[in-house]
Amino acid sequence: MRKIIFMAAAILFILTNTTFAARENVGVIIIGGAEFKTDDYYKIVKDELNPRSGAKILVGNDMQSRYQKYWLNRGYVGDQTPRRDDLISFTRMSGCGKVVCLVVNNSAVDSHNNAGRREKDRISVQIDAYICTPTAVADVFTASCDSNSKTSNLRARRGAFRKCLDTIAKSINRQI
């Protein structure tokens, strides 16, 4: 009987320790224009960010809504320019172990129209990525990339965003 009780206690102890060691979630928010807050861009983030820790990436309308609620609780309607303390405070409120804040600066559009040919769009995008924990802004990474498209500036913008995130992900995946 003692062996059974001891084995049950050991199994219970092992199971509770593994639940505490579960993977943490990493939230990702995009701070920038509305054109960057669509499913296409959320998919790019999920494709590019692959944490070595095995953490689950939370990105999309749910995380963006949490960010909006954060500002609403502070008395603002809509996005505000965050300070360092705001990023830390949002990370605490988000329920995630870490939050990656992707600040997308205004993209520059350069159009070339050759005689008799289609217009060619070139878009430049700069992304500042802040890795935030509940106690500090742990690190920052910056990338600026451009992309060309003969068909649409939306495609060029997506391509530039993907290139920037690919550059940032090479460094950021080790830390999240």
Which residues does each predicted region cover?
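C-terminal/domain-edge helix-coil "capping" segments
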Residues: 21-27, 36, 40-41, 93-94, ...
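N-terminal segment of the mature soluble domain
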Residues: 24, 34-101, 171
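Bacterial N-terminal signal peptides
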Residues: 7-16
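Short hydrophobic segments within beta-strands
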Residues: 29-31
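Single-residue recognition of alpha-helix boundary sites
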Residues: 13-14, 114, 137
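Positively charged n-region of N-terminal signal peptides that target proteins for export
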Residues: 1-4
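Charged, amphipathic alpha-helical segments
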Residues: 96-114
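Short, P/G- and charge-enriched loop/turn segments at secondary-structure junctions
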Residues: 88, 114-119
